[in-house]
Amino acid sequence: MSIKAEEISTLIKQQIQNYQSEIEVHDVGTVIQVGDGIARVHGLDNCMAGELVEFSNGVLGMAQNLEESNVGIVILGPYRDIREGDEVKRTGRIMEVPVGEELIGRIVNPLGQPVDGLGPILTSKTRPIESQAPGVMDRKSVHEPLQTGIKAIDALIPIGRGQRELIIGDRQTGKTSVAIDTILNQKDQDMICVYVAIGQKESTVRGVVETLRKHGALDYTIVVTASASQPAPLLYLAPYAGVTMGEEFMYNGKHVLVVYDDLSKQAAAYRELSLLLRRPPGREAFPGDVFYLHSRLLERAAKLSDAKGAGSITALPFVETQAGDISAYIPTNVISITDGQIFLQSDLFFSGVRPAINAGLSVSRVGGSAQIKAMKKVAGTLRLDLASYRELEAFAQFGSDLDQATQAKLNRGARTVEVLKQDLNKPLPVEKQVAILYALTKGYLDDIPVADIRRFEEEYYMYLDQNHKDLLDGIAKTGNLPADEDFKAAIEGFKRTFAPSN
């Protein structure tokens, strides 16, 4: 077989004509120091703040400190395999998470990767986790109610869609229970919920997920978890990942509830990172920008104007106090950022008042304008009744001979406390809340023994469901109270059938 020179030259010419010079340019640096989840890298001169970088073993990192001679990078994963001298590559991307309908019902980590064993999440949409909060002109004042299903909150400390309401209290006072009940009550309310667990035990997160699944709430909930065993950078990123997933729905005109459980652990993780990055410490060893850490997160909760689609994000951040001290650094910071706080007290919790809400220290700064008219009317005097009861209760312990007016206030107060108690995972529709509070404030419960109040309440709801469904439907549809004589007839009709225990 002879080889022809022309064929060879033709082939070479074709190769030369089709040759495409593809040069990939990577900005790379070298690890000069690594430890405790932090790497110092030399050579990434053009690196952006917050940019993702990739280590040679495939683990991602996030640029935090841009210094003259090196870059301080927090490592978003296992760092044991990273060695001094390893190559680090810029990605040119800011930290992003996947977003969209596909995440609903899933449990993900702060990078948006599924951790529930149900396979990959098939979404091509992503959003950067750090984004600008809506401006003044893009917002609208809070005016729609967000019903939590908890009598004490919906009556005394109402929350509106787009509000930021802090839930604050010691450990084991029922903070998570308040949030879970609120999520359960959003069923059929056209709300999407995002539950962000920061630094929780994995067993606790599993318990929350099972509660949501049992009540059918996972159908509209995304769970973002960075458990206590995860590295500090993931705990720091978790709340931003959660609100980013919520923003996708808000900007599409939907209503979202985001629960951050809890921001104290995020602040502690950020303190750890900052100290390892050698940033100067301030009060309680927190860095100087710990206020900005929380303010830029919570400012992203908003009620958007009609021009922007009228969506909303309601934020329920948690802060854990030590021995009820709400004047510590992180609690005062978050109180000053939010639109009110719900203070849960351990003394009340252990004395059997659950939810253990301290009505005197709790406040909702903007929720009043979102409350339905019926609730406003029946709950108007409730806070004062409760405050004067707590005051008189202290005096009543010293002497037994009280005048009639004082005794009447004490009796009403004891019944008010009893009515505001509620069982776990049993949120109550707003119309039923109005019905029992109407009976309480109009004095229909004054002759019922305190021990029978809870039983009275349950049987009263059953009676209304069977005989006066129109009254409940009227409150639910119009938001107004029915005529006094109709309500009076219903309550008196039930009282005739109710048998007190003594």
Swiss-Prot record:
Ion transport recorded as keyword: yes
Record-annotated site: Required for activity: 362
Main location: membrane
Topology term for the membrane: Peripheral membrane protein
Keywords assigned: ATP synthesis, ATP-binding, Cell membrane, CF(1), Hydrogen ion transport, Ion transport, Membrane, Nucleotide-binding, Translocase, Transport
Catalytic activity: ATP + H2O + 4 H(+)(in) = ADP + phosphate + 5 H(+)(out)
Stretches that traverse the bilayer: none
Location relative to the cell: Cell membrane
Binding site for ATP: 169-176
Role this protein plays: Produces ATP from ADP in the presence of a proton gradient across the membrane. The alpha chain is a regulatory subunit.
Protein name: ATP synthase subunit alpha
Gene name, Swiss-Prot/TrEMBL: atpA
